Amino acid sequence: MFLARFDSHSVLTMGSMNFIERELEGLDPDILLAGINGSRLGLYNYDERLVNVTGNPPVIIPTHWDTFNLPYGFSQEANVEGKLIPFRDFVAEISPESRVVVPVHLEQFAIE
């Protein structure tokens, strides 16, 4: 886990392993890089706990969802259907003001 602060913004990057809420309280990042690897599914309410303790960040970018050890041209559709879409939909339920941004490899995007 890392917290990067620059100007008046902050980015919190999380893996997909457990955490202790009191260690994250008050961080309130503008951007949360949320690890959504399958290992988090065995942890009690991981997604909900993470989003809530970080103050329902305005922007959430899922990471660790792809099969990263295959060529870039390899289809990630199974991971999109099995990991990204369920995560995006769940975040929409628990934090409707948060925007889930799904990056595309080697494509730039701007966060306002």
Language-model features, listed with the residues they occupy:
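Conserved short-loop catalytic and cofactor-binding motifs
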Residues: 20, 35, 75
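Binuclear metal-ion centers of metallo-dependent hydrolases, dominated by the metallo-beta-lactamase
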Residues: 53-112
